[in-house]
Amino acid sequence: MLKQSVRLILASLLFASPCLPQTAQTHPSTDDSARDQVCLNEILIRTSKSDTPAQVTEAQHKAEGLRKAAKKGRSFANLAKANSQGPAAAQGGDLGCFKRGVLAKKLEELLFHMQPGEVSDVMNTKQGFVILQVTDRNPR
């Protein structure tokens, strides 16, 4: 149930089309690129339309500090558990795995070039500031 919630929230943030990830998984492509997948952890620092500019700046600075901590070797999962406001925070930010073609094209271009353990830049989304970590590529 939690995985479903996480995927629905991610769909609103990151997916190229309104179809759910399950749709992509139940209609596999014969193209070899369809076998590519990336597994992700997330840290979300929420913002809302009602936040003041100072609150948004504070959230951005917090996200940037968390990214720096992760880049310096702190456990991304522990940082997510302690700081993320996303639905997968209790699971260390574990969002699961996503096949190529499910995420927004720009995000895929970034994530499918990252190596396991790499941490993304801070991204500003409708939900707030997001940091992603690739945990695995093409898992079997």
Where are these regions (language model features)?
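Bacterial N-terminal signal peptides that target proteins for export
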Residues: M1-I9
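Boundary at the C-terminal end of the N-terminal hydrophobic targeting segment
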Residues: C19-T26
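Well-structured core secondary-structure elements of compact alpha/beta domains
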Residues: T26-K71, Q85-V102, Q133-R140
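Charged, alpha-helical scaffolding/interaction elements associated with membrane systems
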Residues: K72-G73, P116
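Surface-exposed patches in mature extracellular/periplasmic domains of secreted proteins
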Residues: S75-A82, S120-M123
